[in-house]
């Protein structure tokens, strides 16, 4: 419907909670990239990457928690999706009480990859 209004800018679609249909969504929807939520399996993201770029899917709760578990998940995402096309991002919004140190932790981790 957005295209019917004359919008021509690139769009990232977010089929939240529908990992089972993510490939179909990527194939059939007029978006230029697909945002994936935190429940999306890494293998599904890889299959969607073969169709369109993806964005996501770090868990905001893990960002809040920080520590070694956060590093492990960042590493998993980079290993699975880092060859691209992929935009590193959260799976759904940053929580207001996330310590800035945890955001810095992620940025350093990604920068080291």
Each predicted region: which residue ranges?
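Active-site loop segments of alpha/beta catalytic cores
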Residues: 1-113
């Amino acid at each position: 419907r957005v295209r019917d209004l004359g919008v021509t800018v690139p769009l990232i679609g977010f089929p939240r909670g529908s990992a089972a249909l993510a490939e179909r969504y990527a194939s059939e929807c007029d978006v230029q990239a697909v945002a994936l939520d935190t429940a999306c399996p890494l293998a599904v993201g890889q299959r969607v990457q073969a169709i369109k770029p993806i964005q996501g899917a770090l868990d905001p709760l893990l960002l809040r928690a920080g520590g070694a578990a956060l590093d492990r998940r960042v590493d998993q995402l980079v290993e699975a999706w880092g060859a691209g096309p992929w935009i590193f991002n959260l799976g759904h919004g940053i929580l207001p009480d996330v310590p800035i140190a945890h955001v810095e932790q992620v940025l350093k981790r990604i920068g080291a990859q």
